């Protein structure tokens, strides 16, 4: 029960929590009102970097959401040219994370990471179509248990300036394993083949729990 009310925070959040805590103390030295503002800031930092445990279905017939947020795209597209897949068709689901969503990212399937590719870029609004090609982003090419290509892309947003990758090439993943996070507003794209989508645009998703697609 305690962990549900006060989930652990991601390691990336500790330094921000310390900084906001120091700011709160300094603010309190000037006035209670400023101190209250600092306290609200500290609580928000804790909330943003929360890393709650999730109930993972652990079923290779499904893909789960890599992120908390809103489904903004369900479409058929060419694969990412950065991975040499521009001549291959994929289904794609995009999940937009606002600053109030949990920003820890998880793998949608069990499998092996074949490639990780980081691309620097701009920081336009992550909900825009061009964000998937222009923004700072990080690609994971994963082979699922049936040898399908599953691509997860972390995309930095208008506010986000740091993509955190916590995985390595050739790493074996269990469904729902943490693979990284993005700080302060962002998006996650999933490219997949041989699955049928189960979600619609506008639907809310929970990382590791919401079923995105089924074989």
Model-assigned labels for residue ranges:
Residues 1-215:
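Contiguous, well-folded functional domains in the mature portion of proteins
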